[in-house]
Amino acid sequence: AEKELYPGIKLMKMGNADVPSVKDFLINHLDDGDVLGFNGKVTTASFIIDLDEGRETDFELKDIDMTDVWTNRPERSHEPAYIYDVKYHGQSTAQKLDWIRGYMEENECNAHIITSLDDIAWTFNIRGKDIPHSPMAMAFSIITLDNAYLYLQDGTYDETMIEAYKNDGVEIRSYDDIYLDTKRLSGQVLVDLSAINYAIYSFIDCEIMEGSNPSQY
């Protein structure tokens, strides 16, 4: 791999001796007044939080809208999603939501945000073809004590799926609605900061309980 790099590019083999982590490298190379741009939609909240708390100089962290930079970027995949038949997994979405809400109540949480696709696939029994070689659908979700919202890209679901999820107490909403809906949350919200992206995290305007997604247990 090192032989294929352009001149001036150095390969940093993470995990090797004397090779710093990305966070440590940035902390050691950014000076007062420097500006570090990042895409909050693909950068985890935990990475930016750790970078902010660990810095020793006064550099600025700036979330950049990459649509202004990558103007000819291909659209996200919009492959149709589908519900995984209960005979293959044994538990309905409603049953899983009841279990998650029990965990939320034990920890005094009013809401739970899930952004990791494997956790969403398990919780909502949803599958798709948006990720090559992986049965995942592009999605976000918010679960409250009374409601559940599944955020899917327009055109990836149909009326049959809407009705099926409605029977399990789930409302399908547009993919990008997650941001403003997050801002409306109140009380305490359960999030996995190592999974949620910084853009969604920045919209949280209430108390945060940091922890792994219950669906991981």
PLM-predicted stretches and their roles:
Residues 1-217:
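A composition/biophysics-driven feature that prefers long, compositionally simple stretches
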